[in-house]
Amino acid sequence: QELQLSSVGSKQLIRATEDKKEKRRHILIYNFKVYLVMAFCVAVVSLYSSLTGKDNSVVGVTVLLAVLVLRQADFGIRTTHGLGSILGIFTILMTGPRISNLVSPVPAFFINVICILLLMILGCHNVIMYNHSTFVLGYLLLQGYDVTGKMYVRRVEGLLVGMILCMIIFYKNQKNRPYRRTFLDLFREFDVHSARNRWYIRLALIASSA
């Protein structure tokens, strides 16, 4: 059961334990979990690299980050509608970076702004979860390590597999959350005058101009 605790939960347990022997045991279990996660990360990226090619190792990183986030995070909307958000996010990751690399810098800037802004709206309505950093980072990595031809087809295939995996994990862990907001509420509640949405726009502009 202790292995199933989150990082925060493990640290709280260690701090709350007064018996030195028990504290050492909790620390050893926590360190074991850290090494286990590292081994899992290396295995996932290596598997993706072997299946989709070395040029697509970044796909493994992107999917891995998404899986680690969606194990615990949510989108602040109904779980079934959250699956739609995941579909939208991965569709952007499959197409946005490729399209922006096909055009000149000025059109590419506007494409990136739109894509990153959509990633923020779809993936970061619940700001506390910090989902935005994962998906925006994945977008920038895929854009920076662009591929064409057969390698791009493999990239899309790898992202499709990752999307399905994320959907399964997300639904399994979040299906009992009682959210009333729907997918469309993500767009209905968009207001350029709100602090959250101004932050969305600033981040999209900054990331696109980098």
Where would I find each of the regions flagged by the language model?
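Alpha-helical transmembrane segments and their membrane-interface boundaries
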Residues: Q1-A210
